[in-house]
From Swiss-Prot:
Assembly behavior: Component of the 30S ribosomal translation pre-initiation complex which assembles on the 30S ribosome in the order IF-2 and IF-3, IF-1 and N-formylmethionyl-tRNA(fMet); mRNA recruitment can occur at any time during PIC assembly.
Function in brief: One of the essential components for the initiation of protein synthesis. Stabilizes the binding of IF-2 and IF-3 on the 30S subunit to which N-formylmethionyl-tRNA(fMet) subsequently binds. Helps modulate mRNA selection, yielding the 30S pre-initiation complex (PIC). Upon addition of the 50S ribosomal subunit IF-1, IF-2 and IF-3 are released leaving the mature 70S translation initiation complex.
Family the UniProt entry places it in: Belongs to the IF-1 family.
UniProt signal peptide: none
An example Gene Ontology CC term for this record: cytosol
Full protein name: Translation initiation factor IF-1 2
Cell compartment(s), UniProt: Cytoplasm
Primary localization class, coarse: cytoplasm
Gene3D superfamilies: Nucleic acid-binding proteins (2.40.50.140)
Residue ranges constituting the S1-like domain according to the UniProt record: 1-72
Xref: PANTHER family: TRANSLATION INITIATION FACTOR IF-1, CHLOROPLASTIC (PTHR33370:SF1)
A Gene Ontology molecular function term of the record: rRNA binding
Amino acid sequence: MAKEELLEMEGLVDEILPDSRYRITLDNGHKLIAYTAGRVKKNHIRILAGDKVSLEVSPYDLSKGRITFRHIDKKQSFAGAPYRRH
């Protein structure tokens, strides 16, 4: 059985929920719950409320999705922020 194609969508993070889940409002107004993809977790990419994200949604369940990319907002500048070393 072939793997089904996932729907690529963009949305805005409304709320951060427990267990690495997020409440997302898509550009078309639909709301869903999404979790972070493995690559996003692995690279420790922080997602905050108000961030614009790309996500994949299964055609079988349109109420759940997986965040695959966080879009960078050009308005924020981190040039003045001190460098923090772990």
